Amino acid sequence: MTAIERFLSTCTTPEIAVSLLGKQLRLQTSSGVLTAWITETEAYLGARDAGAHAYQNHQTPRNHALWQSAGTIYIYQMRAWCLLNIVTQAAGTPECVLIRGIEPDAGLERMQQQRPVPIANLTNGPGKLMQALGLDKTLNGQALQPATLSLDLSHYRQPEQVVATPRIGIVNKGEWTTAPLRYFVAGNPFVSKISRRTIDHEHHGWMTR
C-alpha cells in the first residue's frame, strides 16, 4: 500500500475531505511541474448518499472509477467542465472527494496561460481549476502517481479554520441537500461562492506559526 493509499483509506471520507485541505496537489507536465494547495473539498458517500453518482450502487461506464481502490482519479464532465475527484476508500466502496478549489503555488504563469482570467477567478471552482491545470478526462481511472497527478503529503499548509457547509448544487435530495459535507479554508480567496469581505488578504487563512 502506498503512502497516498494509507492516507486516504484510514479515515472516513468526510475526515479525508477535511484532511486534504492544505495538502499539495502536484501535476507533472511536459513543460514542468504545477503545484497548488487544496482549499475546498466536498465529500460524497457512495451508495447511501443521494447526492452521489454511486447512489444505490448505481454503476455505469462513466462512474466505474469510483469502485476502484483509494487513490484512483475519477474525472467526469458536467456541461463544459471536467471535475476532479479522488476515490477515498477500498475497492468496491464508491466514495470520493471532489476537489473544488486550489491556491496556485508553482507554475502560476502557466495556469494563467491556460485560463486567461484575473487571478481572483483562476482556480476558485472545480471546473476552473481543471482548466487552469490543463486537465481533461485523460487521467480518469488512473491512480495518483508522481509521473502524472499526485498528492505531495510532505508539503502542506495548516488551515487556521475550516468551515463546513452543505454541498453546492445538491438540490431536492432530502437530508443530503443540507448535509455539511463541503469544507473550505476560512478566509482563503481561492474558494468558490464566498463573500469577498471574508477574505484574509495577508495569510489566505493559513496558520503562520
UniProtKB/Swiss-Prot annotation:
Cited PANTHER family: DNA-3-METHYLADENINE GLYCOSYLASE (PTHR10429:SF0)
Protein name: Putative 3-methyladenine DNA glycosylase
Endpoints of the signal sequence: none
tRNA processing recorded as keyword: no
Family annotation (InterPro entries): Formyl_transferase-like_C_sf, MPG, MPG_sf
Stored SUPFAM superfamilies: FMT C-terminal domain-like
Family note: Belongs to the DNA glycosylase MPG family.
Pfam family, one: Pur_DNA_glyco
Protein origin, superkingdom: Bacteria
Lineage: Bacteria, Bacillati, Bacillota, Bacilli, Lactobacillales
Swiss-Prot/TrEMBL GO biological process terms: base-excision repair
EC number: 3.2.2.-
Keyword vocabulary terms for this entry: DNA damage, DNA repair, Hydrolase
GO molecular-function terms, A-Z: alkylbase DNA N-glycosylase activity; DNA binding
